[in-house]
Regions:
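Radical SAM enzyme [4Fe-4S]-AdoMet core and its adjacent flexible, acidic
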Residues: 1-42, 47-57, 100-109, 161-164, ...
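Short, intrinsically disordered, charge-biased short linear motifs at domain edges
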Residues: 9-14, 66-79, 133-140
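Membrane-interface junctions of multi-pass transporters
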Residues: 18, 46-93
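N-terminal pre-triad scaffold of radical SAM enzymes
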Residues: 30-43, 127-155, 214-218
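Detector for the c-type heme attachment site
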Residues: 90-94, 152-158
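Recognition helices and adjacent regulatory flanks at domain boundaries
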Residues: 97-135, 145-147, 168
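Core AdoMet radical
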Residues: 134-144, 155-199, 211-230, 240-262, ...
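Long, low-complexity, intrinsically disordered segments
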Residues: 504-510, 528-558
Length: 558
């Protein structure tokens, strides 16, 4: 049922959540993100992922969600104990009350309110060992993708993998300790193409039961249209006699750059899905969009967007913008294009979400010097003022062309550019961000055949003024070499049974090129104190990846 009419989120919390316990969250039972490529799972995007047990899913395919670790967390939540992996919410809830005396509302409220009261009551009283079916699921079958966006990395793009395998890791990046560009992220896809994947197999064995109760499945990647599993899912919607298929929402994150035959199959498949949503992405126009999202062709992408808007069957079309240092140069022109689409297809095609990039920090908009940030701040402010003054409405739907929630997001971006100084709490000093910005894009141009100066003429004076720093490699925790052995700082992390993310050791150790933290427990290191022969591969624990933030990584210490 969710909130009653007129009920605030605080009142909902008092009615539905607090009577269960001080730490209850419905997402631990009914929501999951699952990376089937390497077997990682988590209940929302705040806790780090943990590894699915290969032995357990042989007899219980639902264990791709109902892991022993999640059951431990459910038990804690029923008792009112706080899992430490959920510290994002606890930090919010421990903040002071506002001036009106209201306690802050954390994400666990928003992630619980979407479920029916009856389902939450069931979860509150279930034995923790009981297996539950999901209500909402985000899933990635693999990382296959034909794009290699500048701020993406090999964990999510096979084209990025090709870059690293062909050219080696990016050199000289000093500030960003997240390992985005070190190696080909072998942990993200341990199975070769065509090789049996037990996690994908478990998903399809669970699907007949899961599909009876699932309310929403969102498929991400990589690029979902490039994996056979998505067409198996499309066929299920077309052929199934499962009654819930008429109620289930299917959403796909797609870059809409699939070639003609695949796009044809995609559009045809939507005709058989009653509740379909597509989420696509862009944030600049023309050559700048093509530079940021390497592999995108602006003319093809805009044409295929319109073809989808015209021919597909859908409930929603969504534009996910990733706001980075480069897109601000033509962002208002991109919004103009979005408004033109809204005029043609309705105020909701597309719906625009503004998501500010924080990692890698040197590609954040906050890397830009003050004078450029002010220039873009003023341009965006002027654009929004003009749109508000026009007050344009859709001739098709009668609704405001730019919805209030979209205006709010753009307003937050304007404020962000004006007020916020660093992308995240661990951000390096500004001169290091500038150094990395230039070091990265010089290599990016060479590898990808681009020309930064030609593509972003308004940034050239600043770009050319950046000095590449002579910083000792002793301070470079991302210093892979294209050949031979390197000394790299490794941070070994685990997620304990109590949900605490722990860094159990940090040290410098030589490693071979292409070797990642997933090889940390290889037998050749058996003399080392932290060697564990029972843990061979860790979900998302590639060197430098901050599992406490990025939502990929860790292994359960059981």
């Amino acid at each position: 049922m969710g909130r009653k009419q007129g009920e605030s989120h605080r009142e909902y919390k008092a009615r539905m959540i607090d009577p269960v316990s001080d730490s209850f969250c419905g997402a631990k039972w009914y929501n999951a993100t699952i990376w089937l490529g390497h077997g990682g799972t988590t209940s929302c995007h705040h806790p780090p992922a943990h590894q699915i047990d290969l032995e357990e899913i042989k007899t219980n395919p639902s264990a791709i969600h109902n892991t022993r670790h999640k059951k431990k967390m459910r038990d804690m939540m029923q008792k009112g104990d706080r899992p430490k992996e959920c510290e994002y919410c606890w930090k919010i809830e421990d903040m002071e009350k506002d001036s009106d005396g209201n306690e802050p509302v954390s994400d666990r409220v928003y992630k619980t309110v979407i479920y029916e009261d009856e389902d939450l009551e069931t979860a509150a009283n279930l034995e923790p060992s009981f297996d539950v079916n999901l209500k909402t699921l985000e899933i990635a079958f693999n990382r296959t993708c034909q794009l290699a966006c500048s701020y993406c990395n090999p964990a999510f793009s096979s084209t990025w993998v090709k870059d690293i395998r062909t050219n080696g890791g990016y050199q000289g990046i000093k500030s960003d300790a997240r390992g985005h560009f070190i190696d080909d992220a072998p942990y993200a896809e341990p199975f070769d193409a065509g090789e049996f994947n037990p996690y994908v197999d478990a998903f399809w064995r669970w699907w007949p039961e899961l599909s009876k109760e699932l309310e929403e499945i969102r498929v991400t990647g990589g690029e979902p249209l490039m994996t056979p599993s998505i067409y198996k899912l499309f066929d299920w919607f077309k052929e199934t006699d499962e009654p819930n298929a008429k109620n289930m929402r299917l959403a796909i994150n797609s870059n809409l750059m699939a070639k003609g035959p695949l796009l044809n199959k995609f559009i045809d498949a939507t005709q058989h899905i009653p509740h379909f949503h597509v989420y696509t992405s862009c944030e600049a126009i023309g050559s700048q969009a093509e530079y940021i999202r390497d592999g995108l062709d602006w003319e093809i992408w805009t044409s295929q967007f319109e073809r989808f808007a015209t021919e597909a069957r859908y409930e929603g079309v969504h534009m996910m913008m990733t706001i980075n240092a480069l897109c601000l140069d033509t962002i208002t022109e991109f919004w103009d294009w979005c408004l033109e689409m809204k005029r043609k297809y309705g105020h909701h095609v597309p719906g625009i979400s503004v998501n500010i990039l924080r990692f890698p920090s040197f590609q954040s908009p906050l890397t830009l010097p003050d004078h450029l940030r002010k220039m873009y701040h003023d341009e965006i402010s002027d654009w929004l003022d003009a749109v508000r003054e026009r007050g344009e409405k859709s001739e098709l739907t009668g609704a405001e062309l730019l919805q209030p929630w979209e205006e709010d997001q753009i307003s937050r971006l304007i404020e962000y550019l004006d007020v916020v100084k660093t992308p995240h709490r661990n951000t390096a000093e500004q001169h290091l961000l500038h150094h990395d910005f230039k070091v990265f894009y010089e290599q990016y141009d060479s590898r990808r055949g681009f020309d930064f100066r030609k593509t972003f003429p308004r940034l050239v004076d600043w770009y050319d003024s950046i000095d590449v720093l002579d910083i000792s490699d002793d301070h470079d925790i991302q210093a892979p070499d294209s050949v031979g052995v390197t000394n790299t700082l490794y941070a070994k992390r685990i997620v304990t049974e109590d949900g605490e993310v722990k860094v159990v050791e940090m040290k410098v150790r030589g490693r071979q090129t292409g070797e990642s933290e997933d090889d940390y427990d290889d037998e050749k290191y058996k003399e080392e104190a932290d060697y564990n022969p029972n843990i061979k591969r860790k979900a998302g624990s590639s060197i430098g990846w901050d599992t406490t933030v990025d939502g990929l990584g860790g292994t359960v210490d059981e």
